[in-house]
Amino acid sequence: MIPQLNRNYAWAIALGLVARSSLVSAGPCDIYASGGTPCVAAHGTTRALHDSYTGPLYQVKRGSDGATTDIAPRHAGGVANATHQDTFCAGTTCLITIIYDQSGHGNHLSQAPPGHFIGPDSQGYDNLASAIGAPVTLNGQKAYGVFISPGTGYRNNAAKNTATGDEAEGLYAVLDGTHYNNGCCFDYGNAEVSGDDTGNGHMEAIYFGDLTAYGTGSGSGPWIMADLENGLFSGFNAKNNAEDPSLSYRFISAAVKGGPNKWAIRGGNAASGPLSTFYNGSRPNARGYNPMSKEGAIILGIGGHNSKLTVGSSISLRATTLCCTTRYVAHNGSTVNTQVVSSSSSAALKQQASWRVRTGLANSECFSFESVDTPNSFLMHNNFVLLLKSNDGTKALHEAATFCPQLGLNGKGNSIRSWSYPTRYFRHYDNVLYAASNGGVHKFDNPASFNDDVSWVVSASFA
């Protein structure tokens, strides 16, 4: 385990474990407790995280009749009773509805509600995970981990006894080393209680993936990093830590610890061997992270403000440039611009400023944005001017109407990059929308305030 940092809160999660000859003689939370830092949250669907734990690990809900049942370990400290789940779910589907906290603090995880970003399920909630998505074998016994697909997430915004402000804490997780992507963000840890982005340093969570928009490690990833809100960090340098290696183990142990102006990343093979230290030092060299402003909610599978564009959802896009934070991307006929929109605006304007997220017309890894009030018409660029145009089915339009979001270049929200012209982003310039580059021959390519002008806060749509 990681060396202790003053007063500490320990969190543990074990959602997928590799087959091993036997369980270790002490559970992860027993080990933390022996070091004077008992778990305040302990989530695991494959096994008990305390040797003495006999309570429920998780709850599943049956698709055929909506009935639920709890899955417990076979014996104190043991592997989950997958046989009970298989019997209960026979002939139908099951979802994981609750992941219980084994620490005794009641910090259970349930379906994440809508936050800064809305989810794909009803009323904007995130999806629940399939109960059979991540089968594993532990100590010769079948168990099920939690398979997190994009749009799946769990959360507790009222967690008890978790670290807040600049208090110290430790986070530990066992993860599937083959299941990751470059989206933002697969996290487990401490996040905002509101589900909104409340600023740098307001969360501290384990991240695993190969997103390169902010921090990176050596090689091409995936890496263990820390999501501290508005940035993924691998060390002191906000851009790169060459000591944070790309990992290729089938199952990975990941740990992040943080205290006042000190934090650490550790990781290793979950099947055997010790953890290695990838970083141990001062907080990142960026504003807002020293001191930290942690809020104490718990998340799994999502970013602190529920970040992940979801196909089928409806969104509005707000400018983040200081001059223009009440202005949203809207259209007037085929012209795309920014307009001041609020809850008191007309119904017509609210619709003009609302967009449905669709699978990218040219690339399914990215997105296209369909007008709410003009169905089958999409945002696209023509001579780098953004327009609203009806989908004529042509390859040219599909490419011009496909965009790839990434973390906002100014640290806020998202920047939306053209798939067909990867150096160009959604930008407002004189209140008109362009596909602009950071410097170039066009007036709208002016590098002044570029990062602010291409960063957008994504929220639930006005209509």
Curated annotation (Swiss-Prot):
Q: Which residues form the signal peptide?
A: 1-26
What does UniProt report on the pH dependence of this protein? Optimum pH is 4.7.
Q: How is it modified after translation?
A: Residue Asn-280 is mannosylated with up to 7 mannose residues.
Binding residue positions for substrate: D227, N230, G304, H381, N383, F384, H428, D430, L433, D453
Subcellular location(s): the record lists: Secreted
- Among the Pfam families in the record, one is ArabFuran-catal
Identify the keywords attached in UniProt to this record, alphabetized.
Answer: Carbohydrate metabolism, Disulfide bond, Glycoprotein, Glycosidase, Hydrolase, Polysaccharide degradation, Secreted, Signal, Xylan degradation
Q: List the disulfide bonds.
A: C29-C39, C89-C94, C184-C185, C366-C404
Instruction: Give the GO terms filed under biological process for this record.
Output: arabinan catabolic process; L-arabinose metabolic process; pectin catabolic process; xylan catabolic process
Give the pathway: Glycan metabolism; L-arabinan degradation
Report the domain of life of the source organism. Answer: Eukaryota
Region: Catalytic; residue ranges are 27-308
The similarity annotation says: Belongs to the glycosyl hydrolase 54 family.
Function of the protein: Secreted alpha-L-arabinofuranosidase that actively hydrolyzes p-NP-alpha-L-arabinofuranoside and is specific for furanose configuration of the carbohydrate ring. Also exhibits significant activity against polymeric arabinose-containing substrates such as arabinan and arabinoxylan, a major component of plant hemicellulose.
**Domain remarks in the Swiss-Prot or TrEMBL record:** Organized into two domains: an N-terminal catalytic domain and a C-terminal arabinose-binding domain (ABD).
Name-wise, this protein is Alpha-L-arabinofuranosidase B
Q: Which organism is it from?
A: Penicillium canescens
